[in-house]
């Protein structure tokens, strides 16, 4: 058996992501991935047990750096509003890149398959929204009236996914300039800040 290398693993992940984006999960075979990468199917099996395992690795690899940036934004200095704005700006910029949009389109296209949906849930950004909820809870603990941190976290997520992100996702517009994205993120936080009592 040949020695595994991180470079080959990355090459397989990048090639597979391109094929999944073009053909969807069910339209992609490991032979397709092997052709795209320029290797044998056996080589792919040396790194990944199945097509499902390969997709999970793509999702995890794609989300890992994102989660680090976002967690750092929430743990930064300043008021809750300042930290949420930094988070929202970072989040919106990260989810508007071509790779993130392609993975979201794939998730939507294959969402009728429960097993496939679970792959995305296990490897995606769900955990970061728990961090948002906890940041809001920590800052607003003891406020009167009480604040539903979970609901505010969901509202922020909906606002960030509902504007330019949705329009780009469906192909109705090109990715906006960075200043427009930053303003959109700030507006989303401003909208939920009225319910924060801070």
Which stretches of residues belong to each language-model region?
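Amphipathic alpha-helical segments that line or abut small-molecule/effector binding pockets
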Residues: 14, 81-97, 101, 105, ...
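Amphipathic alpha-helical segments used for helix-helix packing
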Residues: 95-122, 165-172
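Hydrophobic alpha-helical bundle segments that form small-molecule/ligand-binding pockets
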Residues: 114, 126-153, 173-176, 194-198
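Amphipathic alpha-helical linker/stalk segments
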Residues: 56-87, 138
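Hydrophobic/aromatic-rich alpha-helical bundle segments in the mid-to-C-terminal region
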Residues: 140-189
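A short secondary-structure junction motif
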Residues: 61-69, 98, 114, 131, ...
